[in-house]
């Protein structure tokens, strides 16, 4: 059975993911940032840091998006502060979600094996 605090952190991670996804699609006017898709969020045990894993369809611009969206992390933190029932809103760090690239790599390897 999961420890109660783990369940609470997972619930906060889900809420943070929803809030940031909604903000990107509805509140952000920057076309570059709008291309980002939030895949998942990890929240530190003390709830002080939220790592937000994003990706985009065009892999060539992910570095530009990360630079720009990390520059706007204060905007997203303000949204969290207004919507989360926490004493202090977590600092937000946006990171590239490389899991999709790894899945594609595994699938291509499986196709190569299947072709032999």
Curated annotation (Swiss-Prot):
Keyword Lyase assigned: no
Keywords: Cytoplasm, Ribosome biogenesis
InterPro entries, A to Z: KH_dom-like_a/b, RbfA, RbfA_dom_sf, Ribosome-bd_factorA_CS
Cellular component GO terms held in the UniProt record: cytosol
Gene Ontology BP annotations: maturation of SSU-rRNA
GO MF annotation, one: ribosomal small subunit binding
Nuclease keyword on record: no
SUPFAM superfamilies documented for this protein: Ribosome-binding factor A, RbfA
Subcellular location(s) per record: Cytoplasm
Role of this protein: One of several proteins that assist in the late maturation steps of the functional core of the 30S ribosomal subunit. Associates with free 30S ribosomal subunits (but not with 30S subunits that are part of 70S ribosomes or polysomes). Required for efficient processing of 16S rRNA. May interact with the 5'-terminal helix region of 16S rRNA.
Family statement: Belongs to the RbfA family.
NCBIfam families assigned: rbfA (TIGR00082)
Assembly mode: Monomer. Binds 30S ribosomal subunits, but not 50S ribosomal subunits or 70S ribosomes.
The protein, known as: Ribosome-binding factor A
Gene symbol of the encoding locus: rbfA
């Amino acid at each position: 059975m999961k420890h109660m605090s783990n369940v609470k952190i997972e619930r906060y991670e889900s809420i943070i993911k929803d809030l940031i996804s909604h903000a990107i699609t509805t509140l952000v006017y920057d076309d570059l940032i709008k291309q980002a898709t939030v895949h998942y969020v990890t929240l530190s045990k003390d709830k002080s840091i939220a790592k937000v894993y994003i990706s985009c369809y065009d892999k060539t611009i992910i570095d530009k998006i990360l630079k720009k969206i990390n520059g706007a992390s204060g905007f997203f933190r303000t949204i969290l502060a207004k919507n989360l029932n926490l004493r202090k809103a977590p600092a937000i760090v946006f990171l590239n979600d490389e899991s999709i690239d790894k899945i594609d790599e595994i699938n291509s390897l499986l196709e190569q094996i299947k072709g032999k």
